[in-house]
């Protein structure tokens, strides 16, 4: 069964693409009775405020017609930023050699949080270098991941 995020991704990606942007990912967070639907968009050269506004208007119109969210919600559209979340294996592949932070659903070696250099991707496994040791993690066990911004 597909998640709400997966359903929204499928429903909205073409409309976002038609506006010249890539739908990088979607996060849905419930706080009390309200939900926040957060869309991350990206494009070559970076995302502008106007891009976010255009995507927000288009997505709002689609969601009003399709009505896939039963509860009240707020829609947010933004760039993924420097510490961008990673949602898919192809996105992870773009950041091989960089530091990422990962939060797991099920602990590995009694740890849910890992941070290290993304070494490689093989099938559905990612390999991080953590304290000079390889740590292999199953992609399906990753609850949340993001690039670690360096300044």
Curated annotation (Swiss-Prot):
It is found in: Cytoplasm. Pfam families: DUF150_C (PF17384), RimP_N (PF02576). The keyword Transmembrane helix does not apply. GO terms for biological process: ribosomal small subunit assembly; translation. Gene3D superfamilies: Ribosome maturation factor RimP, C-terminal domain (2.30.30.180), RimP-like superfamily, N-terminal (3.30.300.70). Keywords: Cytoplasm, Ribosome biogenesis. Its main location: cytoplasm. GO terms for cellular component: cytosol. NCBIfam families: PRK00092.1-1 (NF000927). Required for maturation of 30S ribosomal subunits. Belongs to the RimP family. This is Ribosome maturation factor RimP. It comes from Haemophilus influenzae (strain 86-028NP). The gene is rimP.
């Amino acid at each position: 069964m597909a998640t709400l995020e997966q359903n929204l991704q499928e429903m909205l990606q073409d409309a976002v693409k038609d506006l010249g942007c890539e739908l990088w990912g979607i996060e849905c967070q419930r706080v009390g009775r309200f939900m926040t639907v957060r869309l991350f968009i990206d494009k070559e050269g970076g995302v502008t405020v106007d891009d976010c506004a255009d995507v927000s208007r288009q997505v709002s119109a689609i969601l009003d017609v399709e009505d896939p969210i039963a509860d009240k919600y707020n829609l947010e559209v933004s760039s993924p930023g420097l510490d961008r979340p990673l949602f898919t294996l192809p996105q992870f592949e773009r950041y091989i050699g960089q530091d990422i932070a990962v939060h797991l659903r099920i602990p590995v070696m009694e740890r849910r949080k890992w941070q290290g250099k993304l070494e490689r991707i093989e099938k559905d496994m990612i390999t991080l270098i953590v304290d000079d040791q390889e740590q292999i993690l199953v992609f399906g066990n990753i609850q949340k991941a993001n690039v670690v911004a360096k300044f």
